[in-house]
C-alpha cells in the first residue's frame, strides 16, 4: 500500500529483545523475528509465552502497562521504533489489532471503521474508497453499518476491529489472537481475508 520495494525486503526486524514490567518482572528474553514484505509471520506459543507482549513491544504499547524494552532493538523499514508513540507508528504503516473485540461500543460500525482513518491526509474520496474495500472484504459490516458496535456479534466486532485497522492503510498488520472465541466458519473467513491482504 505504500511505496514499491523489492519483495524480499525485511519490513520488521525484532532483534534479541528483553521486556520487563514494573522494573522487575522479566517477561521476554532474547526474542528475535523478521517479517518480510508481503509475508505472513505467526508467533506460536502457549498461554503466557509472551506473544501479546512481543506485539505490544513492536506497537509501542508497553508503556501503558508499565512495561519497557530494556535490551535489543525493534526496527521497521530499517529505522528504530524506540521512542515513537503508537500513532506515529500507524502513520509509518504499522497497526495492531488487539486481542479480544476492541470496538467503540457506543459508535456505529461505520463510525468505528472511520476512526481508523484518523491519521490519513489523502482526502475524503480515498477514505470513502477504502471504506468500500472494507465492506467488500466484510459484507456483513455493510449490512450492520448503522448498528451500534456493542450490539453486534463477536464475529462482527472482530471484523470491525480488523476493518478499522485496514482504514489506516497499513503496510503491516499485527493481529493478536484474531480467531479467539469465533465460530470455525468465521475463523476460516477471517484467515482467508488476511491471506488475501
Language-model features: locations:
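A short, flexible loop at the N-terminus of ABC-type nucleotide-binding domains that lies
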Residues: 6-14, 18-30, 37, 62-67, ...
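ABC-type ATPase nucleotide-binding domains, specifically the catalytic core motifs of the NBD
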Residues: 22-23, 41, 62-65, 109-129, ...
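The feature captures the beta-strand-to-loop junction immediately N-terminal to the Walker
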Residues: 44-46
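Short coil-to-helix segment of the ABC ATPase nucleotide-binding domain corresponding to the Q-loop/switch region
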Residues: 55, 106-116, 145, 175
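Conserved ABC transporter NBD signature motif
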Residues: 69-79, 92, 126-131
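ABC ATPase signature
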Residues: 107, 151-152, 165-166
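Conserved ABC ATPase signature
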Residues: 148-152, 156
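A short, proline-enriched helix->beta-strand linker immediately N-terminal to the Walker B motif
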Residues: 167-171
